[in-house]
Amino acid sequence: MEMKRVLLKLSGEALAGPKKTGFDEATVLAVAKQIKAISDEGVQIGIVIGGGNFWRGRTSETIDRNKADQIGMLATIMNCIYVSDLCRYTGMKTEIYTPFVCGAFTKLYSKDSVEESFAQGKLVFFAGGTGHPYFSTDTATVLRAVEIEADAILLAKAVDGIYDSD
């Protein structure tokens, strides 16, 4: 089956490499080069990235769950900005979308805007999860995949399958 459009889910932990937290630039640059190789084959790529290299709401017993999930959403934005910039370094054009206004860092998500970005040959990042607490980035992955009519979801994470709870 020829795939024209895919949605890639990267775990935040994948960005940390052996450091387990933050970013490991060599690891992320290698991932960016692999993404570019797929893109160079003519495949349109959407990407959702988790925030687990910075924050996991379930690890805090003192912070309100809504606030914890908001911190997680912000972590996904940081991850998308970082990976997007390394993808640009490899020669790709990128765009980052969020489900809520995030100043000049991202564009507000709409299917029409995303379709325009794909038509312009851009790699599209979906940051901020669903924009609502209590939903993992795995939920956001499936939601965005359906919305963009992806041919497949590709998972690059340290867990077999998807989270059905956090």
Task: Report each predicted region and the residues it spans.
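Alpha-helix C-terminal capping segments
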Residues: S39-D40, I81-G91, L143-D151
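N-terminal glycine-/serine-/threonine-rich phosphate-binding loop
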Residues: M1-Q44
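Gly/Ser/Thr-rich active-site loops/lids in small-molecule metabolic enzymes
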Residues: T27-L29, K67-N79, R144-A156
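Short beta-strand segments
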Residues: L7-S11, I49-G50, Y97, F126-G128, ...
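Internal active-site segments that recognize and position negatively charged phosphoryl groups
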Residues: D112-D164
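Loop/turn-to-beta-strand initiation segments
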Residues: G42-G46, G121-V124
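Ligand-binding beta-strand-loop-alpha-helix segment within the catalytic cores
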Residues: S60-V124, T139
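Short, active-site-adjacent cap segments at secondary-structure transitions
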Residues: A14-A16, G52-R56, G103-A104, H132-P133, ...
